């Protein structure tokens, strides 16, 4: 529905614009938007907002961005693969129209970039909202004719413009979703001399299972039925919390520690600046009588005069130690080992088990995050298939149950580095023992298009067997011809003659040479 031109898009809107213009927001929504604004400020490096002006140095070490980027990379950096269970039962023979359709939709919506946006929204705000919608051919700018039947869009909607309403008795049941953001509206004023003035109004789109209503300001502009019977929005929580409809942000516990770290680093910076150009204290003399500058010599001072720089009587060891403790707490509470962010660590031929143990906090956190992401992607796939059926972009294969048609499995790529040779040896052993299938082995190796790859391998195997059979047949023919020639020689020599063996040859001659000798009188090897 975001297909008309606007100066302000739903992707660059500021939370404050909605807070200032929308008076119908609940206290809960206002608090949520304020929290989102704080999270985004810290991610973008604005750590000193709202603290007032100061002459002190403002050192900013943005660990919030580094932590979020690491979480996103570790969880979704390798992407994911989709499989349809009933299509994988006989992967070497069965076609996969549903899997191919889903892969086509995700790839058309830039799957990798979508994963990054999804991960950022989850990690920063605690939630990611994804909308699945259909664009008709007349709504698409398609100069290359790539979408004659329209296209299905999958978009990550900013959480600061989504206002969900849940059932009072079921916190997981979504009964209404409102998308609201300010847009620029041009209005004509005056009867004789008209001019266009630009004002901001809130555009709202209210989705229920039956209808979709659009508002511009307080005026209802459009109402149309919901053709899908579902609310095509999916909420993916970052980390769930019992009793709450929103997820937990990865920055919730990191921000206070990052602020304290910046404060103490700024204090140390101020101390260093102070002692690099210290204050000079003069006792018993006038400053005007002393010449300032480098390589100057002061003489003729009064007897009791004294000049010295203001010095620090204690070192910075305690401050540096406190900062070190803050960084340790930051990594422990943030669930990211210091080495994962590029810290110095001894790297050798580390085993996979040791590497997993070192990164265990990050792995455990990612495992929880992926549980919700996997379930959310499955819901998105169901919506894609339902919209595809409604818009006649796909059909249910004959004999396939509805439950099987909408059922998909999601597999994430393991982002921990592995020894490829050891992994292959382990897979080979499991295949020999019958503990693994070729399809499962390819999934573990992160192969794409497994079905087509298995078909290609099977075709190559059949071709190699055909070539081997042809070679065996040729060899058999050659052996038969040789045997026939040898038999002919034996029959001509007669049973009374006993051939002498020499180096494995009959009378020192090969069967071919013997035939030549019988027919021409010479075996062809003599120079006579």
Placement of each model-derived feature along the sequence:
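An N-terminal domain-start capping segment
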Residues: 28-46, 174-214, 296-311, 485-488
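C-terminal helix-loop subdomains that flank or include functional centers
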Residues: 293-305, 314, 318, 325-528
């Amino acid at each position: 529905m975001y297909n008309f031109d606007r100066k302000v898009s739903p992707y660059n809107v500021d939370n404050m614009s909605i807070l200032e213009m929308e008076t119908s927001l609940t206290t809960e929504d206002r608090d949520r938007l304020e929290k989102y604004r704080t999270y985004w400020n810290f991610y973008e490096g604005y750590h000193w907002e709202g603290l007032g002006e100061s002459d002190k140095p403002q050192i900013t070490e943005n660990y919030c961005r580094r932590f979020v980027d690491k979480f996103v990379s570790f969880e979704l950096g390798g992407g994911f693969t989709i499989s349809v269970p009933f299509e994988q039962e006989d992967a070497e023979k069965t076609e996969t129209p549903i899997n191919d359709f889903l892969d086509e939709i995700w790839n058309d919506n830039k799957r990798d970039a979508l994963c990054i946006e999804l991960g950022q929204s989850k990690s920063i705000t605690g939630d990611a909202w994804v909308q699945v919608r259909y664009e008709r051919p007349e709504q698409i700018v398609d100069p290359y004719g790539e979408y004659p039947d329209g296209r299905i869009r999958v978009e990550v909607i900013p959480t600061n413009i989504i206002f969900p309403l849940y059932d009072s008795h079921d916190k997981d049941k979504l009964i209404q979703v409102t998308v609201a953001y300010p847009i620029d509206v041009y209005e004509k004023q005056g009867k004789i001399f008209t001019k266009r003035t630009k004002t901001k109004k809130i555009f709202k789109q209210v989705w229920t299972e039956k209808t979709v209503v659009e508002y511009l300001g307080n005026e209802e502009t459009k109402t149309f039925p919901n053709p899908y019977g579902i609310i095509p929005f999916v909420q993916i929580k970052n980390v769930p919390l019992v009793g709450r409809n929103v997820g937990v942000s990865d920055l919730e516990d990191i921000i206070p520690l990052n602020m304290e770290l910046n404060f103490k680093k700024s204090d140390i910076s101020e101390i260093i600046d102070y002692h690099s150009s210290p204050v000079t204290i003069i006792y018993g003399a006038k400053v005007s009588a002393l010449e300032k500058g480098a390589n100057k010599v002061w003489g003729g001072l009064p007897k009791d005069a004294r000049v010295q720089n203001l010095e620090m009587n204690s070192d910075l060891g305690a401050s540096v130690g406190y900062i070190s403790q803050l960084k340790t707490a930051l990594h422990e509470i943030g669930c990211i080992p210091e080495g994962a962010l590029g810290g110095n660590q001894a790297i050798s031929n580390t085993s996979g088990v040791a590497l997993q143990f070192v990164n265990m906090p990050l792995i455990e956190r990612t495992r929880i995050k992926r549980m919700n992401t996997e379930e959310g992607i499955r819901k998105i796939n169901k919506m894609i298939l339902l919209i595809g059926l409604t818009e006649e972009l796909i059909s249910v294969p004959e004999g396939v149950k509805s439950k099987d048609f909408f059922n998909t499995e999601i597999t994430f790529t393991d982002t921990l580095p592995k020894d490829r040779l050891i992994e292959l040896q382990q897979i080979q052993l499991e295949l020999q023992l019958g503990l693994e299938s070729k399809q499962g082995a390819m999934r573990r190796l992160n192969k794409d298009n497994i079905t087509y790859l298995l078909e290609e391998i099977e075709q190559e195997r059949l071709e190699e067997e055909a070539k081997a059979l042809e070679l065996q047949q040729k060899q058999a023919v050659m052996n038969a011809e040789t045997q026939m020639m040898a038999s002919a020689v034996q029959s001509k020599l007669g049973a009374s003659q006993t051939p002498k063996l020499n180096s494995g040859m009959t009378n020192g001659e090969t069967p071919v040479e013997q035939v030549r000798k019988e027919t021409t009188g010479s075996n062809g090897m003599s120079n006579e």
